[in-house]
């Protein structure tokens, strides 16, 4: 299997050409993107994965650079990240990414995080929708460039983590925190950026917790968009009573008219490290 080795620093406009189905992009765990344990923040890893997805799709002709010219865009619907360990400060690592299935309105994209020696830090899975920028409704992926994305589906490269789980809330969830949203929370599509939900949610635990716990798996499923000025409310309950380190979350937004609407659901699974 051939993997395309490309550095995002050297991307440039090029004639349309058939590239490999798998992209590989180098990143650096910059120290100001690492936590007090000297490891990369989960939020920054998620951001690197989204950047890799953007590089990969743009190079192959169905990314944001082209979609924006026809008033369409990609939006992240679901993301799951499962890690064995995290890159340390100043370590170089690669995010590999590939599309493993496509439907009319959604596509499935996988990730692998690995260093130069082949050590695997972890994997990710994601679901994306293509939407119309005016109506905000899903649009036909196969109608873009005569279904060009079909030429880049890779089904044999391994991504050995669990599929997305169902995040249930029972009505017994506890409100832990409410926060306001500001300029730095908003992305290019005009809504609260995907990674900000991850960062705000992981702030719900203090440093003492992170001294003895490692984020093994993080899942997020987006339900509705939140926008600048909305208040975000974080509700938590244990996923299973016997698993004290496994949590389900419901995040809602409170709008200017005091309406509370669910925006996403999350799961966070920790491993004890002591």
Could you say what each language-model-derived stretch is?
Residues 1-15:
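N-terminal amphipathic/basic-hydrophobic helices that include classical n-h-c signal peptides
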Residues 14-76, 123-125, 132-214:
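Hot-dog-fold acyl-thioester-processing enzymes
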Residues 14-25, 80-165, 222, 226-228, ...:
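HotDog/MaoC-like acyl-thioester-processing domains
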Residues 77, 107, 216:
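Exposed loop/turn and edge beta-strand positions of beta-sandwich/beta-sheet ligand-binding modules
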Residues 173, 177-267:
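Acidic/His-leaning functional-site neighborhoods
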